[in-house]
């Protein structure tokens, strides 16, 4: 079974992005799933990563070990994917990331523990705008090169 997981960015505006990606790729997968973040419903400004990792774990617990998982994630969703993978919650066969805000995550999400990036072993392609208003491209590129395992191609 080939399953697609969509992890949108932090802002509730990214829900529409996730739904569009889900709709676009739905026919190419046996199953699709988009995580709806709790803070979108409560009105809080940012996601609580540990809570969202648990929601991913609950979702995938019922899936067969033979499920082939692809993750498409945007911004904070990419950070969430890195954390969930590092914690062994999910083991995708490939990932596609759009805009990874490592500069924002270094203190708040990773707390200068870069093991989710250093130990990352999933073939991944990442896209990042040169003029990204949220996450600096140069910092993202440098972080992937210096702290990454070599599995994320920017």
Where are the predicted features?
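Catalytic histidine neighborhood in serine/cysteine hydrolases
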Residues: 30-33, 145-154
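Short alpha-helix in the alpha/beta-hydrolase fold that links the catalytic acid
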Residues: 18-20, 110, 136-145
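Conserved serine/cysteine hydrolase catalytic core
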Residues: 107-123
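A conserved short beta-strand
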Residues: 90-103
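Acidic catalytic loop of the alpha/beta-hydrolase fold
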Residues: 12, 104, 130-135
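Short beta-strand/loop motif that positions the catalytic acidic residue
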Residues: 120-121, 125-128, 132
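Serine-hydrolase catalytic machinery in alpha/beta-hydrolase-like enzymes
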Residues: 1-69, 79-83, 113
